Amino acid sequence: LHYYKHGGFGQIKLREPMILGHEVSGFISKIGSNVENLLVGQLVSVSPSRPCNKCNFCLSGNQIQCINMKFYGSAMPFPHIQGAFREILIVEDYQCVSADGLSSEEAAMAEPLAVCLHAIKQADKIFGQKVLITGSGPIGTLCVAAARRAGAEEIIVTDISTNALTFSDS
């Protein structure tokens, strides 16, 4: 939303036209010859993270720690990395997770929800505790849901936008 509304965030500014989007799901239309466990027509959530497979972390099998990770819809490098909000997107099989039983909208929320679930895991003992969530945009709102699910006794949400707070409160 920051790219769309403000042309960037902080020091990161758009310097060329860029397709937005890193929250993505889609139906598989074609599969490569070596791909297993995915089917044409299947709905998948797509991870926006693409490791370099060249740094020390990647070479040791720890791609999640890649120091050159590329993310769909990022203006950090130049040229920018185009986003996933398009009709056709070619992805690697490791980026796809079956979203059977979900709508495409729900499947697209897998990445932001994963951010929130990771935060809950890092916080450790949430059950019965007071939790502060700073910012009630899409991620903050999902964090409210995750904190509720984890059994937080009280959830306090802050934001500079009254509209965002009202939405988070519901």
Residue ranges, per PLM feature:
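Adenosine-nucleotide cofactor-binding segment
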Residues: 133-136, 144, 148-170
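Short Gly/aromatic-enriched secondary-structure transition segments
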Residues: 2-7
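Glycine-rich beta-strand-centered segment in the early N-terminal region that forms part
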Residues: 9-59, 100-102
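Hydrophobic/small residue at the entry helix of a nucleotide-binding pocket
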Residues: 115, 139, 147
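Residue-level preference for short coil/turn positions at secondary-structure junctions
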Residues: 39-40, 92, 127, 151
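NAD(P)H dinucleotide-binding glycine-rich loop of Rossmann-like/cofactor-binding domains
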Residues: 54-134
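Small/polar loops that bind or transfer phosphate-bearing groups
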Residues: 20, 47, 111, 135, ...
